[in-house]
Every structure is written in structure tokens, then in C-alpha cells.
């Protein structure tokens, strides 16, 4: 185990030195980002330089031709689905998801990543996606291992979803641990 820690430390130091050297020796123009072919642009919580999870952010993502838009989904006490990262307490919190879907439906090349903050939204979300004919362009993220059963038991059971799971960087060298991860993936779909 000690050798893994030493390796991790040396790798971290090398990365820091490399980034620092790059930042110091390159001019601003040389440091501009360039994207490789088939790079996907995702508008996280809407779009850069807008307030998260707002209709303004959705409009900006559409205007900038984002290929995927990520929206955090929660439910108001009155059962309205809204875009919100934070817990929704009142019936005025968050922008209504239905308003965002009305904008997105006319953008046929945009996929939608719904970050599920609470599983009670799943059946209502599915109904909205069917109503707006967006089911085939949508997928779920933010799914914790303990929430997989709720997804599988919901109307969203046939949608693609991505599991939130952070495997150990150090245990990954163990065959037993890798088998545990494979089993977890099999069990969660």
C-alpha cells in the first residue's frame, strides 16, 4: 500500500509542476483551448454566464447550440417539477421544468441530461417527456446506488441512466475490488 501512496504523491507533484510550467511559459494566446474532433459541448445547469437552472440559461444553451443541456430536477410542494439544484421549499421556488421543455422541444439536436435530485420526480418527469415528445433525447444522471430500485420501479425504468459512484483509486488495483465493481454494475443495470 505504501508504494501506491508514493506513486500517487509523485504523480500529483509532477502534474502540478507541469501545469505551473505551462502557465508560466505560455502566452495567453498559446493557452487557448482547442477541442478534438467529436467533442461534445454540455451546458451544465443551462449555460455559462447565466444563473443556473433558469429559462435564461436554457435559452442561452439553445442559442449557443449546446449538444446536451443538464438540468437539476426537483419538485415543489404543489407537485410542479422545477429546475433547481437546491431543495425546493415553496411553490415559488425554481423555474417550471415544463417551460424549459417547451423551449427545448424545438431544438431537435439537443439532448437532455436530467440530474435527478429526488426520485419522487420520476413518474411526473416521464409524463412530461412523453407529452413533449422528448423521451428519446433524454437520460438521467445523479442516480445514487440506493436510488436504482426507485428508477427501475418508475415509469423511467427504460430510460438510460448514469450511476453516481466514486470507486477507490487505490482499491482499483485489487482483483476483489474490481469484481465488486463489476457486480455492482451488473446489479444496477
Give the role of each language-model region:
Residues 1-189:
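Phosphate-group recognition and catalysis centered on beta-loop-alpha active-site segments
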Amino acid at each position: 500500500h505504501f508504494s501506491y501512496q508514493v506513486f500517487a504523491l509523485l504523480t500529483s507533484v509532477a502534474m502540478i509542476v507541469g501545469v505551473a510550467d505551462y502557465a508560466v511559459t505560455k502566452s495567453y494566446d498559446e493557452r487557448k483551448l482547442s477541442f478534438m474532433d467529436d467533442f461534445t459541448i454540455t451546458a451544465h445547469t443551462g449555460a455559462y454566464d447565466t444563473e443556473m437552472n433558469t429559462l435564461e440559461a436554457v435559452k442561452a444553451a439553445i442559442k449557443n447550440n449546446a449538444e446536451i443541456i443538464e438540468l437539476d430536477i426537483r419538485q415543489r410542494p404543489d407537485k410542479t417539477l422545477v429546475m433547481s439544484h437546491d431543495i425546493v421549499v415553496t411553490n415559488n421556488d425554481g423555474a417550471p421544468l415544463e417551460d424549459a421543455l417547451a423551449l427545448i422541444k424545438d431544438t431537435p439536436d439537443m439532448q437532455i441530461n436530467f440530474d435527478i435530485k429526488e426520485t419522487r420526480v420520476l413518474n411526473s418527469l416521464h409524463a412530461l417527456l412523453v407529452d413533449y415528445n422528448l423521451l428519446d433525447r433524454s437520460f438521467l444522471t445523479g442516480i445514487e446506488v440506493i436510488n436504482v430500485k426507485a428508477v427501475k420501479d418508475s415509469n423511467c425504468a427504460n430510460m438510460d441512466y448514469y450511476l453516481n459512484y466514486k470507486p477507490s483509486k487505490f482499491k482499483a488495483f485489487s482483483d476483489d475490488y474490481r469484481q465488486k465493481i463489476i457486480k455492482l454494475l451488473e446489479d444496477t443495470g
